[in-house]
């Protein structure tokens, strides 16, 4: 009986020791903290690459913005022309929505109201 009791105590002690060692090793791994100034060669290189990419796409962004501006200006001008055409004193003038022009009913030619 003494033999089994000593085996149990030994086994319990070994399990406790293993648990303590495992727990402390886990804490040791998670408690590492590395503080960098953020001014490493790698971060400078990444920043330079990002800036270069931003500059490369700049002309594309400008083209997209210019195109959007042109489309808006065209729609705005067409809206104004439609209003002028519909309010025109010329009874033969009508607005053609497909071509966005004011046309003469008799001749089909463009009219400037």
Swiss-Prot record:
This protein's record includes keyword Signal: yes
InterPro entries on file: DUF1283 (IPR009700)
Keyword check for Oxidoreductase: no
Keywords attached to this entry: Signal
Classification via NCBIfam families: PRK13659.1
Membership in a protein family: Belongs to the UPF0482 family.
Full protein name: UPF0482 protein YnfB
């Amino acid at each position: 009986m003494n033999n089994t009791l000593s085996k149990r105590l030994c086994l319990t002690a070994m399990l406790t020791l293993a648990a303590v060692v495992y727990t402390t090793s886990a804490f040791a791994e998670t408690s590492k903290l590395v503080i960098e100034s953020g001014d490493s060669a790698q971060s400078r290189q990444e920043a330079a690459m990002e800036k270069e990419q931003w500059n490369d796409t700049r002309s594309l962004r400008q083209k997209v913005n210019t195109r959007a501006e042109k489309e808006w200006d065209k729609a705005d001008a067409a809206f104004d022309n439609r209003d002028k055409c519909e309010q025109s004193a010329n009874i033969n003038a009508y607005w053609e929505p497909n071509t966005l022009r004011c046309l003469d009913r008799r001749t089909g030619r463009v009219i400037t109201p």
